[in-house]
């Protein structure tokens, strides 16, 4: 045999042996354990290497399949367990360098388009070599070979990334191999002794490929076709490795002197430059820039390479900053380096545009410039004083050149252009100050209306300018410059609004912090410009001039309405300055009001707008100053009202803004009258009517046009929204002075807008912006409307009128004529003698007419348009607050809805679904109205039983006519539910108001019993089950309400018991008819189960009210048992609807109670059967976590019922059942549903009330349960997919055990082990839902421990705080600021905010217990600031965490603060000092102030 096997080697070397045979022999030699070739592994490696080398050197020829087989053979060997075992034993095996070269060449061929063999196999071979420390020596020992491999792999992956438009999927293997190569290369690079050699190798071969790859990874638009592993993990890891390679190769500290020599412009460093020649790198920066400034072969490639260069320059500068500028050193070198990099973007040394620069590159160029300037800002390399004193303002002059570059080449449509200017402003405001007028013109006054991103960047820049000059206390200077720009001749008359919302908000904030004198100075400056620009030229009628003055008037209004008002503490000189300003302003307003403008047109409109705006500003400010400052006396108190009157006398006002300002002045006049002790109501009524302007409201259009609260944006399309907002926001002031006609017009306009809003969006309004529709909806839902009874009544009457307005009046005259008759016409002497008001007589007549119409089966036919119109009106009605309605309005609305429900009829079958929807909405609205306080008035108009009978008669009539035959199951069930809610609410009203309870209920029960018999006969004859189902729904509602009344009155109980017996007697045959009928498929199984459950509970209620043991009272027990058995069959074998499961569990609970009551023989078996069924249900593989959560409530109720009289044997059996599920091994075995079932039952069982013997048994084995749960948590936490499914429920069960066992768990070790389990719960899930559930579960467990076991918490405080720190750290990581593309959804942000609130809450609880371990307070603060230093938090997240840590700082004494300042590292110390400063300024002072008044 040895001879045979030894011949294998000879045959492999023999040139006559065919290559396919050689390959087979080689495979056999590797696999066979009996092949005893000496050093077999090395021999086979050498043979494979030789074969591949010969082929690729073209010394031999092979078929393609043999070449493919050789690579596959090599790959199989490299990844085999056998080779791994051989290498792990220390045996030396080596590959030849030619293999590495061949692999490198094949990668190059593939990138070039030559694809001869399976490239995936070659990459797999490369991966196998590099992941083996022994075999990877062929690359790591030859640095240049590894560089070549990395360069070619970068080219390969870059080629794949660039081919996105060809829709070819990315090769996962290529990126995996690239990451392995990068890791190996980084290790080898760090081991190189000669840093210059590394620099030249990287710049010559790797720099551009790596930067291109990084750029493509950053800018790729990832799609679902891309592999998730590449998108989420590999791309980030590769970018990190690339950064590490470049930074360590190009910016070593050893190279600093070389860079310094190259970029330093000083002549006195010439000697250093000469001495350095030959010692280090020559022109390293120039070498780098030469390598990255590559020109493309085409337009597309040229644009790509410029983008790579631009993005790379800011990255390289960041590397240089991190490497050379640690501790604030070498700032001057860094600056000169940055200057060179900025020049490399395509500019000359003087920062002019290079002749080869393309205009299309501006966007990318400005982004790079922005990043460079921001890095400069973050690195703090610009010290203004040092630059001016020591370096002759070198940096300042350079930044001035950058500013001029930006202004000379304005890119108004590029957001980065504005951000670059903002960065220069942040460096030093003096950089932009020489060009301040140009800046204000370009970005503020003359800026064009642009897209959202550009507008945001522009507004951010203007806001930054305002904030900067506010801090410098130079706002007057800035405003003066702004006024100069505004007053210049405009290139275009249509200038944008001077004060958009964002800029106005910033200006207001700046003015609040600004000294009052300066604010008054600003107002004076604006007023002087208005005087100089407008008054001398008022007859010139120049529209451009009017627009400018209007802009300045808006600015004056914004300034006066923004700074703090005068008060009694204001110094007298400031009051005098204010008085002088107000006097001058009054003079201007009066002069404008006295002007007589000859011609109409835009000029006149603008002048009137300016006049009214200044008048409104003056009277509001004057009134405010008078109210708050007694030192201030109005320039002319008598002239204030005269001024308003003159302004209101400006007629023929066509300008929308002018009309709005007149309304504001009228409102001011109304407020002034209200402040007086006596005022004429006629004058106030006149002002209120002027503000409302019912002529305009009656013809209002554009109800959905949005308005942004800005005066400058009030025009013909937005005026309606602005006017409606003014009216509604001041409704409490003007409503008392409106006559009925005004209120009616207001209500009609409001209803019209509400209906239009429903037409536009289906059922609800979109809460974006302010429009007439949105304002009306918000007013309808707000409590303000409820507090205005006249307006509310007008709206209710308007809705009633609209409901009848859609119907044919001739039909309504026949059915219910009293609706169309005013109340006064119904007055009769007899009624007056009886004390009945005309309105009550009318309403009673309506009720009688409605009952008569039902009896006579009268109807009103409806078209499709009428049905849709009524549906919209009913939806609006559903939002009305029934508690706010007057007695008469409530009754009229309810009777209107009831009449509609009883009489309307659908004439077209095509509209049937909309008609059923209308009926459903009508029943729902009536049910909600029955909950209001005036609901008892209904029973004074119509007897309760008559109302119930009329409703059911109509429904039975509709059913017999076949109205419901074509309905699908969900629609029919939804309709039944609305009917049931209404019937139940009405019966509850009869019972609660004690309105002849026995008489009404007995009459209605008898009516239903008689109708039930008729319906069953009809069902047998026609197969129509709808009437029968309506009977069952109604009888169920009737029985439920009667059951809730039992036990209050003995005589009443006897009557109700009789009625319950009467009702249940007919329900059993009815439900059996439904179950056997063909139409039962329309109903869900839950319907039948709920009905039978009601029947059982009725019988139980009757049995409980009787004196005997109840055995003979439950007569239908056989029927209930058969139903029970059917439920057990259908409960868990396969998926079932959730409503069926919930109703079935309720039925099991009721049936068990009935079984206990009747003392059935097999009660113990029944008990175990139910428990086994519930466990099997919860263990179902189809049950999701959401389903289990939804079933927890019903199952808890059932367990309480089962455990209340549980025997010791039954309880023991149940615990044994649970023990089988609490096995951690089942998690690994994939039986998670069984484990979840046991965990859920344990959690619910802990909340049950046990008999004493069961309670002792349960809490005795609780330590074992806790241990099992901990093992389950540990096992499930290994798989991220099980976090929410099993880990969190297990933790919730532990928390419940801790809370419920507060008095029973005495061993502290049982609590401490729970703390240990919390360490295993993963808090790094990619899914926010999983993260939030895990976070909340850990928090609740910690809260249970701190609340129920404070002594244990103190004993194990380090472990407790470590668990809590995991929460803090995770919420900081998740709550860090992210880019726009990586920003979380609104739902995720809300979940994260909840987590932050929980952390704040826990901090407060820890702080309340911190008095017992104050030593750890400083430790908690140190942990917090250390984590805070690493991330930039979202403001709302930071706010909650900061409030929480403040509570811990309350317990830090001075010694702790000194300790923290001493031990914390430099960066962390700065964060702590900032935190402690804000704590001292805001929180500590407030707390001390509160303590001052605390007893």
Curated annotation (Swiss-Prot):
Primary role: Essential for hematopietic stem cell development through the regulation of p53/TP53 pathway.
UniProt signal peptide: none
Pfam entry (one): Urb2
Keyword Nucleus: yes
Phenotype upon loss of function: Mutants show a notable decrease in the population of hematopietic stem cells in caudal hematopoietic tissue and early T-cells in thymus. Compromised cell proliferation and excessive apoptosis are observed in the caudal hematopoietic tissue.
UniProt cross-references to PANTHER family, sorted A to Z: UNHEALTHY RIBOSOME BIOGENESIS PROTEIN 2 HOMOLOG
BP terms from Gene Ontology: regulation of hematopoietic stem cell differentiation; regulation of signal transduction by p53 class mediator; ribosome biogenesis
Entry's localization field: Nucleus, Nucleolus
Protein name: Unhealthy ribosome biogenesis protein 2 homolog
InterPro entries from the UniProt entry: Ribosome_Biogenesis_Reg, Urb2/Npa2_C
Domain of life of the organism encoding this protein: Eukaryota
GO cellular component assignments: nucleolus
Keyword set, alphabetical order: Nucleus
